[in-house]
């Protein structure tokens, strides 16, 4: 596997983010448009996204490691924002690329990290969720671009564990009282 063309401008910040993830004992995965570019069809994206299994108490340590990798906060109130939203808003200093790290704590997120795999992209290796888990996360986000991303991942991986996808998407749909999370993507698997 090589770095998809639309993602080549992100090699430097992605390398720094992966180094940060490695320093965090690989307790996370790269998600979002970057993951879609490797597991589905490459597309334009404006930022890098990751999910780390971390409590807000671990944020100071993550920020210190991030600084050593050339990654800095995008806001002066990063601790307050992280406590309220469970997201770290960061920036790769050299490239200016935005990096958002979600702080995961749910059992599903623990499974995503445990099932994650390292993909060799030639000039770098990155830790990604399985195609199934990326689809589940995209179904929950449920923006129009996420539905397109889901289709590209399905097209690239014909032997998906649809039972796992259905189970988790329906579980989140029930909790969020949004049945369309599953019904909007169900036909894509046929």
Predicted regions and their residues:
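Compositionally biased terminal segments of proteins
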Residues: 1-190
């Amino acid at each position: 596997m090589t770095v998809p063309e639309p993602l080549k401008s992100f090699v430097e910040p992605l390398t720094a983010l992966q180094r940060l993830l490695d320093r965090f004992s690989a307790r996370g995965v790269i998600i979002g448009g970057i993951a879609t570019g490797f597991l589905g069809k490459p597309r334009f994206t404006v930022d890098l996204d990751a999910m780390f299994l971390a409590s807000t108490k671990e944020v100071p340590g993550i920020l210190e490691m991030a600084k050593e990798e050339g990654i800095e906060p995008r806001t002066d109130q990063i601790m307050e924002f992280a406590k309220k939203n469970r997201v770290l808003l960061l920036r790769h200093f050299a490239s200016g690329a935005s990096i958002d790290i979600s702080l995961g704590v749910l059992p599903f997120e623990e499974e995503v990290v445990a099932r994650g795999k390292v993909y060799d992209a030639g000039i770098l290796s990155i830790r990604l969720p399985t195609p199934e888990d990326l689809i589940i996360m995209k179904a929950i986000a449920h923006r129009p671009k996420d539905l397109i991303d889901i289709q590209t991942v399905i097209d690239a991986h014909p032997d998906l564990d649809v039972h796992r996808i259905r189970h988790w998407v329906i579980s989140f749909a029930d909790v969020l009282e949004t049945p369309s999370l599953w019904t909007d993507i169900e036909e894509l698997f046929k």
